[in-house]
């Protein structure tokens, strides 16, 4: 489940990429949520459209809650966004007036609008995302190359991979999740503390080395203040040095869910890699995804369903494994079982206590690319397109750029 295993193949392998650099400045990456609905104008929650820069969604929520006094547990958001780039998204704040929100002045956050609504905004309550991406230092014929690749993606679909941004700054969030699912709590703590080769700053590296040498107090004193998770875990471990499970449960519940979700994502990506060249075809035994309503059905006659797949009405699905996930049959089922077995997990492993139970669901192996546009601005190549909720622009960039290690 190492990261490089997810970056080995392309759907458009026969087409050369643009190369180039991405995310050199925040303005290179702009994402705007496409809302499912607008606030109704009444209720105890304020829906605020924010523009955040250089901070994660969770950090934006922390800052909003500190500024308004709203409890984090009652604050809602539709989608998780990372720190790099500029994001426009909606968050809901309980028992705070729109006027109070509009009057906020918070570093890294600009309030664009605020209105009342009756209920908390829930994860997944968005139609999709619009992206504007700027690529720098591309090859001279980058526009022609990108156009050819986008044409294929528009016809065959975008591989619905999660990709490396799902695995955290050190690229091991999925491994933390797998250790938790396997009940390897010491392994989870070791991974949480990090790898000194993957962090910046002598103090941070020294903190990790101190932990590895068993010096918990020394490690705690060295970890920088922004390493909140590591410090919380160490504080618990210092009180009970052998209780690694208790230490892991010092992690914020949202973060624990993220680690588990990252493991699900890595396993899905592995299935996708195996089926990459046939993501626009269904096979017998598949659970096919209906793009008009998100329902799934068992494919019993692949030949009969082929025209619907060609029209992009349906697509094969892959697993977000869980204790109650519906499994396919036949060859697709055998493939998915082999990948779960290789990870040393079973469906029952996802039935965790403490609000961490992962029931599982199906996810389409491909998604439609909506409204792709290309433009050349000075010496840069600018891409614009939309994707459904839960799908990532990096899946498009990876095909377009074909350069490892550039964030795509």
UniProtKB/Swiss-Prot annotation:
Q: Could you say which enzyme class this protein belongs to?
A: isomerase
MF annotations from Gene Ontology: pseudouridine synthase activity; RNA binding; tRNA pseudouridine(13) synthase activity
UniProt entry tagged with the keyword ATP-binding: no
Q: What does it catalyze?
A: uridine(13) in tRNA = pseudouridine(13) in tRNA
- Supply the InterPro entries for this chain: PsdUridine_synth_cat_dom_sf, PsdUridine_synth_TruD, PsdUridine_synth_TruD_CS, PsdUridine_synth_TruD_insert, TruD_catalytic, TruD_pseudoU_synthase
Ranges for domain TRUD come to 157-367
One biological process term in Gene Ontology: tRNA pseudouridine synthesis
Q: Which PROSITE patterns match?
A: TRUD (PS50984), UPF0024 (PS01268)
Keywords for this protein: Isomerase, tRNA processing
Function summary: Responsible for synthesis of pseudouridine from uracil-13 in transfer RNAs.
The entry's protein name is: tRNA pseudouridine synthase D
């Amino acid at each position: 489940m190492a990261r490089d295993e997810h970056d080995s193949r392309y759907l458009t392998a026969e087409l050369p990429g643009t190369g180039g650099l991405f995310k050199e400045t925040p303005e290179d990456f702009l994402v705007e949520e496409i809302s499912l609905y607008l606030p109704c104008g009444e209720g105890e929650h304020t829906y605020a459209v924010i523009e955040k820069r250089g901070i994660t969604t969770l950090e934006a929520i922390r800052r909003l809650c500190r500024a308004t006094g709203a409890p984090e547990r009652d604050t809602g958001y539709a989608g998780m966004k990372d720190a790099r780039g500029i994001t426009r998204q909606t968050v809901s704040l309980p028992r705070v007036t729109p006027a109070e929100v509009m009057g906020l002045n918070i570093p890294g956050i600009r309030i664009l609008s605020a209105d009342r609504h009756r209920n908390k905004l829930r994860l997944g309550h968005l139609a999709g995302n619009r992206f504007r991406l700027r690529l720098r230092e591309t090859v001279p014929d980058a526009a022609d190359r990108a156009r050819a690749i986008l044409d294929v993606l528009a016809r065959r679909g975008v591989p619905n991979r999660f990709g490396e941004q799902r695995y955290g700054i050190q690229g091991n969030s999925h491994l933390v999740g797998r250790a938790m699912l396997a009940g390897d709590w010491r392994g989870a703590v070791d991974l949480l503390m990090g790898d000194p080769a993957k962090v910046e700053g002598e103090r941070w590296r020294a903190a990790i080395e101190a932990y590895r040498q068993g010096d918990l107090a020394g490690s705690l004193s060295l970890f920088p203040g922004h390493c909140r998770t590591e410090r919380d875990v160490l504080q618990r471990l210092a009180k009970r040095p052998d209780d690694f499970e208790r230490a892991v449960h010092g992690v914020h519940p949202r973060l624990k869910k993220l680690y588990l979700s990252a493991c699900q994502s890595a396993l899905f990506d592995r299935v996708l890699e195996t089926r990459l060249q046939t993501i626009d075809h269904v096979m017998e035994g598949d659970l096919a995804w209906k793009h008009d309503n998100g329902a799934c059905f068992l494919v019993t006659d692949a030949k009969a369903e082929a025209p619907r797949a060609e029209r992009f009405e349906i697509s094969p699905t892959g697993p977000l494994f869980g204790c109650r996930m519906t499994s396919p049959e036949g060859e697709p089922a055998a493939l998915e079982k082999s990948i779960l077995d290789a990870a040393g997990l079973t469906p029952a492993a996802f039935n965790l206590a403490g609000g961490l139970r992962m029931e599982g669901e199906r996810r389409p192996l491909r998604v439609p690319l909506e409204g792709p546009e290309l433009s050349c601005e000075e010496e840069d190549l600018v891409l614009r397109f939309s994707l459904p909720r839960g799908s990532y622009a990096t899946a498009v960039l990876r095909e377009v750029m074909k350069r490892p290690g550039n964030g795509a």
